[in-house]
C-alpha cells in the first residue's frame, strides 16, 4: 500500500501539501520525474508535473538514475549535493526517477493557481486573555 505526501507548487510561488493513501495514490505509481499527470488525483483541475521527491529514509530522487532502485552515484554537482568545492566528487546514495511504494514525498508543479484556503480562526489568544482576567479578579 502506497502512502504519499505530495507538495504542490503553482506558478505564483504558493504551495500546499496533500496526503494520499492506498487506492488514491495508485495512479502515481510508475510515473517518472518530468512526466505530467492529471491533477484530479489531488482534487484540482489541470496538470501536475513531477519535479522531485524522496523516500522514507530521506534519500532524494534524481532524474538521471533510471528505475526505482537506490544506488550509490559519484556526484560533482546537482540534486543531492551541496557546497562541493571545484573538482570535488562525492559518492552518495540516490533514488531512481520512478515513483514506487518506497517513495514518501513527491514534489509537483501545478500549471494553474492553487485555490486560496482561509486560515481557521484562532481561538487560543482569546482564551488566554480570559484566563488572565479571571486571575485579576
Curated annotation (Swiss-Prot):
Pfam family, one: Ribosomal_S6e
Domain of life: Archaea
One annotated Gene Ontology cellular component of this protein: ribonucleoprotein complex
InterPro entries with a match to the protein in the record: Ribosomal_eS6 (IPR001377), Ribosomal_eS6_arc (IPR020924), Ribosomal_eS6_CS (IPR018282)
UniProtKB keywords: Ribonucleoprotein, Ribosomal protein
Region spans: Disordered: 114-137
Any GO molecular function: structural constituent of ribosome
SMART domains assigned: Ribosomal_S6e (SM01405)
UniProt cross-references to PROSITE patterns, sorted A to Z: RIBOSOMAL_S6E
Compositional bias ranges of the Basic and acidic residues kind: 128-137
One BP term from GO: translation
Positions with biased composition (Acidic residues): 114-127
Cysteines joined through disulfide linkages: none
Family the entry assigns: Belongs to the eukaryotic ribosomal protein eS6 family.
HAMAP family in UniProt: Ribosomal_eS6 (MF_00512)
Name listed for the protein in its UniProt record: Small ribosomal subunit protein eS6
The gene coding this protein: rps6e
